[in-house]
Amino acid sequence: MAAKKSQKVTPLMQQYNSIKLKYPDAMLLFRVGDFYETFGEDAVKAARILNIVLTNRNNGGERTELAGFPHHSLNTYLPKLVKAGQRVAICDQLEDPKMTKTIVKRGVTELVTPGVAMNDDILNSKSNNFLCAVHFGKKNLGVSFLDVSTGEFLCAQGNTEYIDKLLQNFGPSEILVQKKFKKEFNESFGKDKHCFYLDDWIFKIDYSEETLNAHFQTKSLKGFGIDHLEEGIIASGAVLYYLAETRHHRLQHINSINRIAEEQYVWMDRFTIRNLELYHSTAANAVTLLDVIDKTISPMGGRLLKRWLALPLKDAEMIEKRLQVVDFLIKNPEILANIQDQIREISDLERLISKVATQKISPREVNQLKNSLNAIIPVKELALKCNNEALKIIGDNLHSCDLLREKISESISEDAPVLIQRGGVIASGFSSELDELRGLAFSGKDYLDKMIQRETEKTGISSLKIGSNNVYGYYIEVRNTHKDKVPEEWTRKQTLVNAERYITEELKEYESKILGAEEKILHLEQELFGKLIAWMAEYIDPVQQNARLIARLDCLCSFAQQAQAENYSKPEITDSYGMDIEEGRHPVIEKQLPPGEVYVTNNLHLDREEQQIIMITGPNMSGKSAILRQTALIVLMAQMGSFVPARSAEIGLVDKIFTRVGASDNISMGESTFMVEMNETASILNNISDRSLVLLDEIGRGTSTYDGISIAWAISEYLHEHPAKPKTLFATHYHELNEMCETFERIKNFNVSVKELKDNVLFLRKLVPGGSEHSFGIHVAKMAGMPQMVLHRANKILAKLEASHSMEDSGAVLKKSAEDEMQLSFFNLDDPLLEDLKQELLGIDIDTLTPVEALMKLNEIKRMLGNNKQQ
């Protein structure tokens, strides 16, 4: 909103208001002298976000809020504004105030938004900063991702579920949406995204094709392999439109657009990505898989590893190539160490060369680019000497950029500053004109020393001094005791208490030369630096290629280092439908164990013929969920091309990983824990394939016991009878499901073993054949610190209930019900009170019960028994 107006608005505020009207959705940083000022509502927001002083100023009779900061602090305050979700329009002075007698011309030079930023203080070095656009088509949705700081440009299209998965994977900082689809977007993807809404006309195929072809200087998009993706093209066009609107016109580094090939990568929906905690966790300070396996050194390597984690491969040949490189590096630790030593010398090549394209690179960063390219030479030589085909290909394709490195070396000083205004950017010997000017400007001390010596000899004044100030410039200072010796041609300029200051024609001449030289030096350095940057733009493609190859090599070195350190093994990827893991471990839990504690490994076998579904029972806290997660993580790591935490692993290619793990709710969308659970499970059942891996944990826990058992049974039966026969791990504490193995031949029972001691339970965390009959919920309650009285009473009630129920086995009822079309019919008790108690206890979910709730429940049971005695 523009600042408050009145009939007597000052010319400065008139100018501010006219510019603000063009950017109503952005905070306007308005350059006034040495400060960036904000006014009105912008000032209120800025003061709150930046914790700076909010004041008022008189604006033609009105009071206007004002908050500002020094212009040189822009890089300190701008990131804070953008990270707070603000779109920031930077309005600069477009002319020198000294050169105009009227108000200084001003204009917006850049619009910085959460998704469009080049500032290093805004960006995370190991994460992409994606701007995204989503287009709602008639049949499909289109999506596009662009990181303006690296030049990566991607697009895809598909159903809502696929786009949702991509949004989860790529985590865009800002999403562009058509205004009329705001409601649909919120319903499909939630309200927690940072969105900006654009006019409908932007989302048209003709406009988008024209925009993309104009940008890439092509006549067709066939060469990029996206010509058939109409919705994806429309989304991509919207992204380029937004860049133009935000004053980002220098985009030479965005020289390609790639399709996200859905068929090349393992499918993981957003629930799976969340449940496996690949790179985010809902728990505070939780360790993710990325935290454990990321041993990358370079920023671009870190970003690529995150992409590999989000998009594991389905192509066995591509996986094997990665594994072979990792295997070679492990067997040749000296080569691994040498390559990593050189990668440490390489800065963020992708973002540095992007700054060349956008002309935002500093002199010091140009040297960083040169040093990074220098470090690539030994990497290239090492890779070419390796007895590994994939590494040789990397070596072949690394560009030495000889001319670029040479040009930077001869033109830029080794100790070049960050800001060109500080001078000393261009190396000596590069420009004879510059060297001559520097000789004049910086040989001043010698010249002045000679002048003092000469004038002292001529006048006989031994205490002569030459100095300068902003008012009088250069002067000769003579003490009062010697002023009678001053020559007549000297002109007195200033009288002090003990001295007089004079100027001479020679000194005036020298001063004009010095001042002119310094100004010319700055101008010439800026001109030469600008020409160098324009020339360097010719190397955008080869430097980007180097960045991609170094990132790839960095990831493979990271895999090798991790495998060495943690004793991982090379997985065998096959075309079979089975899975055989020997002594598998959970990579994250293993790293968090106390010193000296050994991780309990587990074997696991799945196939389509005999052991398609493993039903895992066992007490709470025994490690059922860990076994499920570690299986998924081992498969995922293997198909990334990494070694895995197991003694051995033979894995038939998996094309989809589904997980339903842990309880959560979605209150903001009006969904209960059970509704969320059913939504996620329905998504799994509707998308399974013959190469799917399905992991289900405690399905049905969010509803009543009978409902839960019925649903869990029916889901297991559905998966068993489905033609795809997906490999499934099903963890449950419904012991009734153990009976399924007698009816369904490919369901096998396993349990996570425990050892019962006199008054305690020891969790062995070992997966063994056979079902478990006990949940040991009361033992878990004891571990949680439940009062002894509650535990004692719970044991008594449990014993009575078990004795009462021994007359008829609930598992047998379930087995019979499966044969009788799932008509559940549980035992009847003659005593109505016992029936009431049974219903009360069966309705208790011990996993979610708090100590206070347990006490209240026991008090209710006691009241029921007391009432019965009185009757």
UniProtKB/Swiss-Prot annotation:
Database matches in InterPro entries: DNA_mismatch_repair_MutS, DNA_mismatch_repair_MutS-lik_N, DNA_mismatch_repair_MutS/MSH, DNA_mismatch_repair_MutS_C, DNA_mismatch_repair_MutS_clamp, DNA_mismatch_repair_MutS_core, DNA_mismatch_repair_MutS_N, DNA_mismatch_repair_MutS_sf
Top-rank taxon, per record: Bacteria
Keywords, sorted A to Z: ATP-binding, DNA damage, DNA repair, DNA-binding, Nucleotide-binding
Gene3D superfamilies found in the cross-reference section: 1.10.1420.10, DNA repair protein MutS, domain I, MutS, connector domain, P-loop containing nucleotide triphosphate hydrolases
Positions of ATP binding: G618, P619, N620, M621, S622, G623, K624, S625
Alphabetical GO biological process terms: mismatch repair
Pfam families named among the record's database cross-references: MutS_I (PF01624), MutS_II (PF05188), MutS_III (PF05192), MutS_IV (PF05190), MutS_V (PF00488)
GO CC annotation: cytosol
One of the record's GO molecular function terms: ATP binding
SMART domains membership: MUTSac (SM00534), MUTSd (SM00533)
Protein family per UniProt: Belongs to the DNA mismatch repair MutS family.
Cited HAMAP family: MutS
Function: This protein is involved in the repair of mismatches in DNA. It is possible that it carries out the mismatch recognition step. This protein has a weak ATPase activity.
Xref: PANTHER family: DNA MISMATCH REPAIR PROTEIN MSH1, MITOCHONDRIAL (PTHR11361:SF34), DNA MISMATCH REPAIR PROTEIN MUTS FAMILY MEMBER (PTHR11361)
Annotated protein name in UniProt: DNA mismatch repair protein MutS
Annotated source species: Christiangramia forsetii (strain DSM 17595 / CGMCC 1.15422 / KT0803) (Gramella forsetii)
